[in-house]
Amino acid sequence: MQSRKLYKSLYFQVIVAIICGVLLGHFMPDSGTAMKPLGDGFIKLVKMMITPIIFCTVVVGIAGMEDMKKVGRVGGKALLYFEVVTTLALIIGLVVVNVLKPGAGMNVDPATLDTGAIAKYTAKAGEQSVVDFVLHIIPNSVVGAFAEGEILQVLLFSVLFGFALSMMGQSGKPVVKLVEDISHALFAAIGFIMKLAPIGAFGAMAFTIGKYGVSSLSSLAALMGSFYLTCLLFIGLVLGTITRFCGFSIWKLVRYIKEELLIVLGTSSSESALPRLMAKLEQLGCQKSVVGLVVPTGYSFNLDGTSIYLTMAAIFIAQACGIELTLTQELTIIGVLLLTSKGAAGVTGSGFITLAATLATVPDIPVAGLALILGIDRFMSEARALTNLVGNTVATVVVAKWENALDSDKLAAELHNPTPLAHGLKVEAPHLTREVSRTLS
């Protein structure tokens, strides 16, 4: 009975799919690369649902608030937390890369590097300033924001719409109820889509190994090893300390979201687990309004794994090219990254684009050095995405506790003995509850 239950669990299925993808990509590279549409298709299916779910969650959460000032407080606390923690991520990346020096001794001449492959990234890096990013949050069309999957634009519209419904009083209640019912249906649909997660993870992993090969990692293994180690240190030390002060264990939280982490590992996209993550955070005891505001905002402003990557990659390039940087120059890089990492948020390939934008503003490090890490960037994206997911999970729980919007007893109970995900969806229709339970558990 236990083996049957394990066999049917999403956790087990995704692990098996990832292993099969690695084996296919390694032994049959051509067949592995042909599996790319499976991974792309799954990610597109999930992204199709993200903006409607964010809209429903935020609207219902805000419209149900009695104190409208709470929205501003939650947003302000979230942004403050994001800035502090991403700064710590940048600093810990700086410390580790200076201690381990993965690029030392490579003695690369920037003039010999092929910059053709990075041209599209450096071009995009110059296209969007911080001002452009802020203006981009305001959509030209609400329909366009939903159609193009612009999370921050949808979040802005959702906040305004939720405020409006709240101000309407009783006359706005039917609309709120309709949006809440739509939310239940959307989560049920996500349950159906998540049945395909093993297929998506298999396709994405088979493509990655088939195209780049395991052997391609050896030349830059030092940087990759240093980066993965730093991500673990950040989760264990920085996020672990934060969660300890808040009264719970980071490792119990990681275990609680293990299915979401495996989906992210297989697809290299932290967005692929966003709908399930939002449902689980509500189940964990966080109020819907806090989840709806913090999680979507965090996906643009609280990218801890990306922050670690940016610092380490920039200093690695300098080390590889034999460039000695002073402490002032390294701190300047961190200051620039605090700005540029926000300016490129939400852009496809944002990590590489942000790095290009940063190097363009720091004359001491050649932009051509990006060509050094282009080949292994795909292999480091898994650690970036996993760390981003854990970071945003912690951020939501911490902000909820800070705002007294967290049921601590429920948090402790769920971390000790997690219940099926459907319980966190608060689905009122009995037939829908059964359907969601079958598809999400």
Curated annotation (Swiss-Prot):
<dbReference type="InterPro" id="IPR001991">
    <property type="entry name" value="Na-dicarboxylate_symporter"/>
</dbReference>
<comment type="similarity">
    <text>Belongs to the dicarboxylate/amino acid:cation symporter (DAACS) (TC 2.A.23) family.</text>
</comment>
<keyword id="KW-0812">Transmembrane</keyword>
<dbReference type="InterPro" id="IPR023954">
    <property type="entry name" value="C4_dicarb_transport"/>
</dbReference>
<keyword id="KW-1003">Cell membrane</keyword>
<dbReference type="Pfam" id="PF00375">
    <property type="entry name" value="SDF"/>
</dbReference>
<feature type="transmembrane region" description="Helical">
    <location>
        <begin position="145"/>
        <end position="165"/>
    </location>
</feature>
<dbReference type="GO" id="GO:0015366">
    <property type="term" value="F:malate:proton symporter activity"/>
</dbReference>
<dbReference type="InterPro" id="IPR036458">
    <property type="entry name" value="Na:dicarbo_symporter_sf"/>
</dbReference>
<dbReference type="GO" id="GO:0005886">
    <property type="term" value="C:plasma membrane"/>
</dbReference>
<feature type="transmembrane region" description="Helical">
    <location>
        <begin position="9"/>
        <end position="29"/>
    </location>
</feature>
<keyword id="KW-0997">Cell inner membrane</keyword>
<dbReference type="GO" id="GO:0015138">
    <property type="term" value="F:fumarate transmembrane transporter activity"/>
</dbReference>
<feature type="transmembrane region" description="Helical">
    <location>
        <begin position="220"/>
        <end position="240"/>
    </location>
</feature>
<dbReference type="GO" id="GO:0015141">
    <property type="term" value="F:succinate transmembrane transporter activity"/>
</dbReference>
<feature type="transmembrane region" description="Helical">
    <location>
        <begin position="308"/>
        <end position="328"/>
    </location>
</feature>
<keyword id="KW-1133">Transmembrane helix</keyword>
<protein>
    <recommendedName>
        <fullName>C4-dicarboxylate transport protein</fullName>
    </recommendedName>
</protein>
<feature type="transmembrane region" description="Helical">
    <location>
        <begin position="45"/>
        <end position="65"/>
    </location>
</feature>
<comment type="function">
    <text>Responsible for the transport of dicarboxylates such as succinate, fumarate, and malate from the periplasm across the membrane.</text>
</comment>
<feature type="transmembrane region" description="Helical">
    <location>
        <begin position="356"/>
        <end position="376"/>
    </location>
</feature>
<keyword id="KW-0769">Symport</keyword>
<keyword id="KW-0813">Transport</keyword>
<feature type="transmembrane region" description="Helical">
    <location>
        <begin position="187"/>
        <end position="207"/>
    </location>
</feature>
<feature type="transmembrane region" description="Helical">
    <location>
        <begin position="79"/>
        <end position="99"/>
    </location>
</feature>
<dbReference type="GO" id="GO:0070778">
    <property type="term" value="P:L-aspartate transmembrane transport"/>
</dbReference>
<dbReference type="InterPro" id="IPR018107">
    <property type="entry name" value="Na-dicarboxylate_symporter_CS"/>
</dbReference>
<keyword id="KW-0472">Membrane</keyword>
